Amino acid sequence: GSVFQDPNSQFFSSELAGEVAFACENYGMAREEVRSRTDAAIQTFSLEHLRGRSLDVLSRGEKQRVAIASVYALRPGVYVCDEPTANLDGEGSEQLAETLKKLKAEGCTLVIAEHRLAWLSGIADRFLYLDGGRILWEKSPVEMAHMSEGERETYGLREVTQAPVPDLPRPESGAVFIRPEDVSCKRKG
């Protein structure tokens, strides 16, 4: 099954259950089988709280999990993901990693095209670098962790490990945290 970089481009329904059920219905599965697979996929990826909400109002991370659940309902053995963390924040990337770890634990094969590497820790068994449809090199997770910054930059790859995020103090309730002044925005064209 394929999971696109932008989940909106693969949605055919405006709500969760309809989206997850779509591919099963398209394959002509019996109504009860569609319902069973839809419910199982929604439960497996902890999406129950999104039932009844429009897909348009979901976060990028939630949409990505819906896209994966939609593919999961078909129970493929292989998942191909095109830059699944594109436009996800740290939390969304962590949720996606947990989702993909579930699939890996079930014995699924994951093929992930990605230049952000840190979130793949514990998921990737090997890394391949492709250029023009050809494999230029293959590395283990240990070899990737020891790749120099210069070599990584040569290939357009990001950090292999997650940079620590400082624990910043939270402002008091009602306090001004950021005060923009003299802000302007200009768009080309």
Tell what function each PLM region has:
Residues 134-156:
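Conserved beta-strand-loop-alpha-helix hinge in the C-terminal portion
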